[in-house]
Amino acid sequence: MGYTYTSLTGAGDHLGFAPAHRATEQLIRDSGLSWTILRNGLYAELFGALLMWDGDAVESAFGPGALAAVAREDLADVAAIVAGDPARHAGRVYDLVGVPVTAQAVAGQLGTGHRTIGLGEYRRRLLDTPDFLPFQPPMLSSIATNIRHGFLGATSADLQDLLDHPARDVLAIAAAAASAARPQFS
């Protein structure tokens, strides 16, 4: 029997929640058991949902930075493929990221503009969000900081090499998530 662990992309080592993933990976490697590690990129759905609407335009703290976003369905497909043939994938670490997407590109897909806000303003808005759990503002600030400074745009062929179909359109997925998050006024 082998174990498959869904971890965090290698490009995510600067994220505040990366150490827990890397420590778990090490424990798995040291266990003596058969293993495969799927280092998942951040979701296109999350990227789009993190864009904030201000009237008819979107805002973010991402600046010109890109995220090598991946569709959650593609990650699920890869996990099923790996689980279907664990011996073939034993001892492997796959970095499952997609193509780089920017907030500006998502805004363009939506037919609207994008405005960059400062990281301090972004943190303030997160802290003022009443439904967030205590860990969420620092986690999301960490993601925004890493995207803004170019740490999460690295690509890899692993996702497409493992999929039995073309990777889903992450720009369209991010735009759909941003559109779904748009406030509706009656």
What role is predicted for each listed range?
Residues 120-186:
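A hydrophobic C-terminal alpha-helical subdomain
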Residues 1-2, 8-115, 127-130, 148-149:
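Oxidoreductase cofactor-interface core, primarily capturing Rossmann-like NAD(P)-dependent enzymes
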